[in-house]
């Protein structure tokens, strides 16, 4: 990256860092069970809600407990279940019309990050009906109170139940972009491990590594606070202690509960301290090829950590100690290597490879352009890279010839 752009990025990031204490961040209030939702709705005299989820979640019967809970309290509900893996502007438009046509009063995002992103974006369109989502992309462009938004994560990974972001894909261009503003933070997050028990092992693994990526990128960035560092470390500890158990024994409710806590802590960490190039690259791949976000993060994370090199060895040492990989007396370089190797070993145990076979060489300049545009100047990464430097990372993610 040229010196002028680098200086601009760092000034921009420092302004946001020093503004952190003045910004209206808030954490969602935690509800420990789906059954607790009715009390929240009844206090507001709400009796008609929209549930935004996806067909897979619905077919597994995961929404049934919520539906029965609402029925017992005489609360009407309507379900939008067409959300796709990388939610599109079409999904949001359809959910918006369902909300308005049925005079709903609140939105419940039920599912993984995609359902919650769709729910957030739908709420934004309700608050600003005369603006398109494209006009809201970027930072602090909503400025309005949203309908009551409740998030029920069925995966322990995205952290979307805590964040001020909604990531949406333009249905026509396939460009994936983020909308970031404080009203998008859900008012309530329901951390109910019972809704995660049916999650298949591979999705448990990829979403768990998504949470790990959130925590790691938040921790190694340049805009941390004591609070975000603590949240990130707590998330890393819980993930290393519980993800393997949740993967091999999906009915272990304590492991599931701890993974939900890890995802929540990681979400709180990166909401204030941001993510980095792992996410920027993963978003470009999700938008272009529908590569699942957690899977992309798991593949990309160790490569980017190695690319940052010596700039993050001390921070990776702290993560290695927290993960139980070494004691505090280990030297920085050795401990950093231990942490990166542990991430590689983890994804290998879960059957996650080293490459993204969907990448087409002719697409790389476009992909790198989108990653550069997303990350710079916003993300306070340890080492700045421009589009041309990011291109080299995409090439490294392509399978070697004859190994597709």
Where in the sequence are the language-model features?
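An N-terminal, well-structured beta->alpha segment
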Residues: 1-79, 400-404
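C-terminal charged capping/lid subdomain of soluble metabolic enzymes
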Residues: 2-8, 316, 326-404
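N-terminal small/polar loop signature for handling phosphorylated ligands or for N-terminal nucleophile
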Residues: 50, 58-130, 245-256
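Glycine/threonine-rich beta-strand-loop-alpha-helix active-site module
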Residues: 90-194
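Carboxylate- and glycine-rich phosphate/diphosphate-binding segment that chelates Mg2+/Mn2+
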Residues: 165-273
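Flexible, glycine/charged-enriched surface loops at secondary-structure junctions
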Residues: 222-231, 246-258, 273-278, 330-336, ...
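C-terminal catalytic subdomain
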Residues: 273-338, 344
